[in-house]
């Protein structure tokens, strides 16, 4: 009777022992799905640390390094394939599959590093640093990187968000990762304490008996008791330490939330309107009907002017239109220029207009320009971080050999500048659409003195997918990171007014013409994250690189001297090759 429950308890362990690779592979995929589930529009931010914990248990061990890479790659596919299907909505599955796989490779590299660093004392910290390093790599290489899917961008509704004001998106991502690796450490500690204590006790007893054989039963019993007490003490300390690692970052985030600026805190205020004119159709042909997008935004702006005249809306000091809100170049088409000028006159404020400008060499520039009734076009922000394989195609001739999609990519060239425009007497920081994903975009704006931030975007080419909500979450993180109110103006939605604490003050629906008007605070003070810039991230990279190098050298030396010795670390399976 007593042996039956013991057998039931050992059955999962027996399955894991028989099928270690399968168990870890399934766990890795589930970990990736949990990470995906933590991203908007779902508010399940708490799934991210759980996903990191499961991923850590999957990749950690002392088997072959390719195992860590392989399990990490599977987790990456489980994460990015459901996160990024919007990249292939109108161009087919090839770009989606290629991009998801490329991003998953970086999770594989994380798995490789985690397998190396998992043998170090304090391994939860080292593995969390490795995650930060892997995110930096994916956000930088190749072709400028692709930061979409950074852990921080799934935390706009979570406890970790206030940390952005102190270390930016890298600190938020590190905090989530550290909480997850702490959970993994707790599982390992509890496994040693609860699931298999008898195995450790027997090993201690056997070792004590062997060491004291022939010395008498009294001495043997004393040695066994001391050894067992030491083992149990170490287990308890491991559990307590893991719990502390788990709670430190979420508690820090909760404690720092009251320190975030209130939505109306500022040196002065400005009344801003964001116009969402919508588009006549979705997809890559959103602007196929000449001037339709421009007419929609001009019409909605003039409706706002009517509301102002009737006292239904406050008079704006500045009107922000989205990216590509003028679907024809207003510098080359007089009818477009006249429409924008008339809209500025009617609303009584300068308009920040988005347009694709055709250069003399027939390349194009994605621009946001200030337009006034008196002087027409003025200061402008030319998009500096342009999207590879969309706005331009690197190595076009090479990729043309494999797909006719190569001829559908644009011929955009990156702009220059500091990421700000002077309009309505203020310095306005601008990150156009894709740029908001990159740390350096608004860092440059803040260095140039931005008092208010805006993200003009055109999401019509991604239909009604989750992309727009994912991007809005990035804007919320940036608002907290730099302590600035932020305006999102989107052609088809979602447009929003975001406070400096990351809260959404106003938000539109998709594909509905709308105008958001708000009195927004202007600030000149800066957050610690703004002042530190990329320094915390570089510190994490340097520490990770040093630790990985040291462990790799030690591992290589040990394998040379003891080629047949192989051990394992507790995790999902103790099989040494898993």
Model-derived regions: residue spans:
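CN hydrolase (nitrilase-like) catalytic-core segments centered on the catalytic cysteine
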Residues: 90, 128-129, 318, 326, ...
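Cytoplasmic C-terminal tails of single-pass
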Residues: 561-578
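Membrane-embedded alpha-helical bundles of multi-pass enzymes
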Residues: 2-201, 206, 224, 231-258, ...
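Short, conserved active-site loops that position catalytic residues or coordinate cofactors/metal ions
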Residues: 39-54, 79-84, 276-277, 313-328, ...
